[in-house]
Amino acid sequence: MLSRLLRDDKLLEVFFSSLDMKKSYLLALSGGSDSLFLLYLLKSRGVAFTAVHVDHGWRESSYREAEELKIRCEEEGIPILIDHVPPEYRTSRDPENAARRYRYTLFHKVCKEQNLAGIFLAHHANDQAETVLKRLLEGASLSNLKGMSPKTSYEDIPLFRPLLHIPKQIIINVLDAENVPCVQDITNTDERYLRARMRKKIFPWLEEIFGKNITQPLLTLAQDSEELSCYMKQQAEPFLENMRKENTTWSIEIPQVLIEQVFLTKWVCKEFFFRAGVVASRHFLQTVYDHLQRKLPAQMRLRDKRVIIKAGVVMIE
């Protein structure tokens, strides 16, 4: 079944055709269905990689499971490193994020030490839908609902997520058909964590209320957001070419033709502030736009900077 999936999945084909097969990579291997699926996928495509498993110590059985993973990888001829999260990370105020930071720091370190060209992560379509819904409910802007990208980076190391379009159920079906045993991580269903509550309660409740699957509409929204973001970057760049820096003062001209386009004006201002080294909130951008639109001069504080608005000009110093 795995070979049939490879043959029929055009997005996977495009992804692997662009991958530098002369290099070696790192696979973040939890031992769950998603990362095991990715392990066999990479192996079937002839990708050279080292698996890295991080034992978080959240379950009594986790040490034994790590050893079983090591044996499985050795039987498959796959190099594997096992690491254990120090106890202080498990007792922090936010153990989930603390463990995540530990993992990524470790992955980065291993990549540097072994000259690995990137990190493979097994996030799938359901993970993507959760990310989009979470960002939507947190009030993210339209252009920030795009979710995770198939190719990003952590510091200077590329991150690859080739499974973002594949639903969790397909992954499970393939592994069941191949009789591949997986680790069942109980933290994935522990309702102390937001992601677990989303999987166990929020998504099932929404699908029951709407009477249909909501994963695909959220993935479509993420794609629309990605396309909007790309379009806005193209539209904004000619105006951002007007940015100037003199000593410690940044400035940009905001012509009337731009002010007539509300969304684009706020996008240009947001990017201007970002390139000048500060992040502007949605409320702050609206205030800046209101002054530009009404031609009202103003001075405001943004973090430790002073923002000056004059006729058709925004400055930050």
Curated annotation (Swiss-Prot):
Record keyword Cytoplasm present: yes
Keywords: ATP-binding, Cytoplasm, Ligase, Nucleotide-binding, tRNA processing
One GO molecular-function entry: ATP binding
UniProt xrefs under Pfam families: ATP_bind_3 (PF01171)
Compartment annotation: Cytoplasm
UniProt signal peptide: none
Record-level GO BP terms: tRNA modification
EC number, UniProt record: 6.3.4.19
Major location category of this protein: cytoplasm
Keyword Glycosyltransferase (UniProt): no
Gene3D superfamilies to which the protein is assigned, alphabetical: HUPs
GO cellular component, one term: cytoplasm
Catalytic activity from the UniProt record: cytidine(34) in tRNA(Ile2) + L-lysine + ATP = lysidine(34) in tRNA(Ile2) + AMP + diphosphate + H(+)
InterPro entries named among the record's database cross-references: Rossmann-like_a/b/a_fold, TilS/TtcA_N, tRNA_Ile_lys_synt, tRNA_Ile_lys_synt_N
CDD domains, per database record: TilS_N (cd01992)
Domain notes: The N-terminal region contains the highly conserved SGGXDS motif, predicted to be a P-loop motif involved in ATP binding.
Role of this protein: Ligates lysine onto the cytidine present at position 34 of the AUA codon-specific tRNA(Ile) that contains the anticodon CAU, in an ATP-dependent manner. Cytidine is converted to lysidine, thus changing the amino acid specificity of the tRNA from methionine to isoleucine.
Family membership: Belongs to the tRNA(Ile)-lysidine synthase family.
Name the UniProt record assigns to this protein: tRNA(Ile)-lysidine synthase
UniProt organism field: Chlamydia caviae (strain ATCC VR-813 / DSM 19441 / 03DC25 / GPIC)
Originating gene: tilS
